[in-house]
Amino acid sequence: MSGCEGPVGPVGPAGSQGTQGSAGPVGNDGNDGNANVTVISLKKADINWVSGSYLGRTSNVYELGAPEVNQDILDHGTVLGYCLISSDWMPLPFIWENTTGSSRQYILYNYSLEKIKLFAYQTSGVLNPGSVSEYRFMLITDNTVTSGRISSVESVQDRLNDAGVDISNYFEVCQYFGIDPN
């Protein structure tokens, strides 16, 4: 038997809500991110040293315009500096003494709002740090509330120290924050 098709009928009422399913398994913790870290790289070829002074000592000075060093970094963070000598990343400040102890070489830095300054000198005068091929600065902010008794720099450094990170080791800091060290 065959029949004719008629028009589609009206939509029926919605069904009742089904029962809640069981909870799924707990997921694994994700990797810590590096949202609070900015890395600034500075190649030797990009540095134009000028004569200046550091704490009254004649030195070579380079000032890097760095808008990334903002008020948040100054209020809640720190800037860690490193220099690449041969194939080794060394922490800043970097102090090298020759084998006889008659001369020391210094490469230092400081930072303020929107700038990072490098200083280079030696006991005998101005230093041209030609053996440094690159500088890297890690701007780290810690937005956790700190008491008025410790600075934001101490807060960041304490957090890294508590995690077993040696801040003088460039690779450990990169690994902690999930940053490609190259």
Give the positions of each predicted feature.
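Extracellular or exported targeting regions of proteins
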Residues: 36-182
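Collagen/collagen-like triple-helix sequence repeat recognition
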Residues: 1-46
